[in-house]
Amino acid sequence: MKYMKIVITVILSFLLCGCASAGAPAQIAATTLPVWEFTSRLCSGTPVTVTRLITEQVSCLHDYSLNVRQVKAAEAAETIVISGAGLEDFLDDLLANASIIDASEGIPLLCGEEQEEEHHHEEGHHHEEDPHIWLAPENAKIMSRNICDGLSARYPQYAQTFETNLSQLLNELTVLQQYGEDTLSQLKCRKLITFHDGFSYFADAFDLTIVKAVEEESGSEASARDLIELITLVEENALPAVFTETSGSSSAANIISRETGCGVCSLDMAMSGSSYFDAMYHNIDTIKEALG
């Protein structure tokens, strides 16, 4: 009898461990701020946990590499949500055998050649296709829908919650788009010089024109020729301000400001920080204040 009790206890222990393992919260990793925020919002009210891989203050991932902690978090995740459109190309080896939700599916991408033709972008270090899709709220809606569909396919027991959360998220993105249109509709100047080549989707979303996008390499500074060209553009277009990126250098912009009297303002790529929405509202308000 005592032997049977021991056997039953052991069997129950294994069963309980199995149940605990089966019922453990799903682990998801998301690469950057926008997809992490959208995924976290969609998973609210479920036991699904979402880890953000890239938390440092960054404005591009050209030369980025994950540290040991980030690699372990990615390997521990059942699913990895990526922004897509080539942004995470540096993760190809890590993602090769992973379950991926690509948030960029179905979004029309701006190509480098198109950017240079339409917005007169400087030739330089940019992706063949511009991956900064989240800077247009309408694209962010598509990203959110893609993530929701991917989550529902993997965790159908929470599909209704995902859909409910998606509805609220889409409403907030609609409000963001409308706020940007209303705030920027009567600008005295609609032309920008930016010290990052990733604001094309934002410009298109709010009917702005990027006269020049300068992508300064890490550790390098604009040449005298570049500065002369930029100063000329500021003067010819009567630009009241030029726009740096929060994580980038402002040295060239400050020189241009001294020579022309234009202001220097900072825009946010919304790749890091604490809130996609805060970054987007900051960009809208900053442009309104700078360009009137």
Predicted features along the sequence, with ranges:
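N-terminal secretory signal peptides that target proteins for export/translocation
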Residues: M1-K2
